[in-house]
């Protein structure tokens, strides 16, 4: 089974909705910054799945459709550190905590 990825449009909307800040209330790190090329920027944020994008992933729900797994309702914008933390400690960061 393939991963149910977010579209670029969803990723962009998710980042902009939180002003490119990590959505973890204990972090709130800025996830974008300037690039040495003036019309570019560096992004260190990720659109993370609340319920995993594929079987075997953290918080995977068999009852979800592919469309539901790849929707903005199943997404959270995080810095890379928090994304790793959320996917590693699934007891602390369960679906209800992330929503």
Language-model features, listed with the residues they occupy:
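A boundary/linker detector
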Residues: 1-19, 30-32
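Histidine-centered nuclease catalytic patch
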Residues: 2-4, 29-75, 86-93, 98
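Short metal-coordination and nucleic-acid-contact micro-motifs, chiefly zinc-binding Cys/His arrays
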Residues: 15-23, 71-75
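Short cysteine-rich clusters marking metal-coordination/redox-active sites
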Residues: 22-27, 79
């Amino acid at each position: 089974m393939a991963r149910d990825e977010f579209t670029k449009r969803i990723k962009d909307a998710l980042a902009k909705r939180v002003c490119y800040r990590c959505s973890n209330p204990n972090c709130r790190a800025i996830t974008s910054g300037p690039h040495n090329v003036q019309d570019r920027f560096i992004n260190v944020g990720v659109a993370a799945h609340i319920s995993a994008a594929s079987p075997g992933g953290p918080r995977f729900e068999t009852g979800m459709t592919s469309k539901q797994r790849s929707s903005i309702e199943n997404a959270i914008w995080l810095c890379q550190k928090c994304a790793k933390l959320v996917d590693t400690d699934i007891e602390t960061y369960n679906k209800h905590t992330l929503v």
